[in-house]
Regions:
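Acidic/glycine-enriched edge-of-secondary-structure segments
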Residues: 8-16
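Alpha/beta enzyme core
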Residues: 1-6, 18-28, 32-39, 43-173
Length: 173
């Protein structure tokens, strides 16, 4: 019915907190069993959530943190450039709250990632990952419904990343 209740907020909070606790335990267990660096990854969609999660992940023992900043905005009134500014704002906030290296994974939905990559480095990121692999839907024509697309990567998935890595390699510090 479109109504959002306090009960729904509680359930969402409880579910997220439980999943985060599982993830933090996984980091702790991995650190206890491995001698190689552990790079944790988080994907949030609100600016405020990143810093809380990042600090907890650092405290769990992660050696570095990947920020998977991927969302698709289809709003007509979304201001041009706001998506890129969100990346910078998230990096600034996270860098204030952790001392471990921070890496940013970008989505493919950028017109020109090179200026953003330069700005991310200027704000102290240790690296950039090109690109996030998007979940692809498909359509079941017999049932006329959406279904999950291919979940596995293919060699052709690399071409766009390789192109942008080549273009950025001599333009990014």
């Amino acid at each position: 019915d479109g109504v959002h209740t306090e009960g729904q907020d509680y359930l969402l909070y409880y579910h997220r907190a439980h999943r985060l606790e599982e993830y933090l335990n996984l980091i702790k267990e991995t650190k206890a069993q491995c001698t190689i660096p552990v790079i944790a990854s988080i994907n949030c969609y609100r600016l405020t959530e990143w810093t809380d999660f990042a600090k907890q992940i650092e405290e769990a023992g992660a050696d570095a943190l990947e920020l998977n900043i991927m969302s698709i905005c289809s709003e007509l009134d979304y201001e041009y450039g706001a998506y890129e500014r969100l990346h910078i704002d998230i990096v600034k906030q996270v860098k204030k709250s952790v001392s471990i290296p921070v890496v940013v994974k970008l989505g493919k939905n950028l017109t020109n990632p090179i200026p953003l990559i330069n700005q991310l480095y200027a704000h102290g990121v240790a690296g950039v990952v090109l690109f996030n692999r998007m979940v692809t839907p498909d359509i079941n024509l017999d049932k006329m419904s959406y279904i999950a697309g291919d979940v596995f990567s293919h060699p052709s998935d690399l071409y766009e990343s390789i192109r942008w890595i080549g273009l950025a390699s001599d333009r990014v510090p």
